[in-house]
Amino acid sequence: MEKSLHLEIVTPDRLVLSEKVDYVGAPGYEGEFGILPNHIPFLSALNIGSLYYKAGGKTHWIFVSGGFAEVSDNKVTVLAESAERAEDIDLERARKAKERAEQRLAQAKEKLDSARAQAALQRAMARMRVRGAA
């Protein structure tokens, strides 16, 4: 039996991560799910939030802005709309994005404006949480 997984995180722009890991935790739409070596194959949609993995006794955090996770043959492939390692997140920029989203939400007149502002707020807050976990 395998004792590790290969985790690959890909966005439309780049390969964010490709490494051997011991565990992956990801933000699914029905809540967080975890993946250990020798997990059964499955495919899941990802919500905006914190993906984390354990490797070498350390926990590493990555912000993901939705996407999909596929598990098969001890490989976890994450196709994310965007992804940032915790150490790469500019906390001040995330705070400003949160403030802008809150202002837009307060001024939203249409449902579409409100939905966009809510999504922007959710992304900014998730980025701040991920950065704080690093």
From Swiss-Prot:
Compartments where located: Cell inner membrane
Protein name listed in UniProt: ATP synthase epsilon chain
Family: Belongs to the ATPase epsilon chain family.
Keyword set, alphabetical order: ATP synthesis, Cell inner membrane, Cell membrane, CF(1), Hydrogen ion transport, Ion transport, Membrane, Transport
SUPFAM superfamilies membership: Epsilon subunit of F1F0-ATP synthase C-terminal domain, Epsilon subunit of F1F0-ATP synthase N-terminal domain
PANTHER family, per the entry: ATP SYNTHASE DELTA/EPSILON CHAIN, ATP SYNTHASE EPSILON CHAIN, CHLOROPLASTIC
GO MF entry, a single one: proton-transporting ATP synthase activity, rotational mechanism
Description of how the protein assembles with itself and partners: F-type ATPases have 2 components, CF(1) - the catalytic core - and CF(0) - the membrane proton channel. CF(1) has five subunits: alpha(3), beta(3), gamma(1), delta(1), epsilon(1). CF(0) has three main subunits: a, b and c.
GO cellular component: plasma membrane; proton-transporting ATP synthase complex
Keyword Cell membrane: yes
Membrane topology label: Peripheral membrane protein
Gene: atpC
InterPro entries, sorted: ATP_F1_dsu/esu_C_sf (IPR036794), ATP_synth_F1_dsu/esu (IPR001469), ATP_synth_F1_dsu/esu_N (IPR020546), ATP_synth_F1_esu_C (IPR020547), ATPsynth_dsu/esu_N (IPR036771)
Functional summary from the UniProt entry: Produces ATP from ADP in the presence of a proton gradient across the membrane.
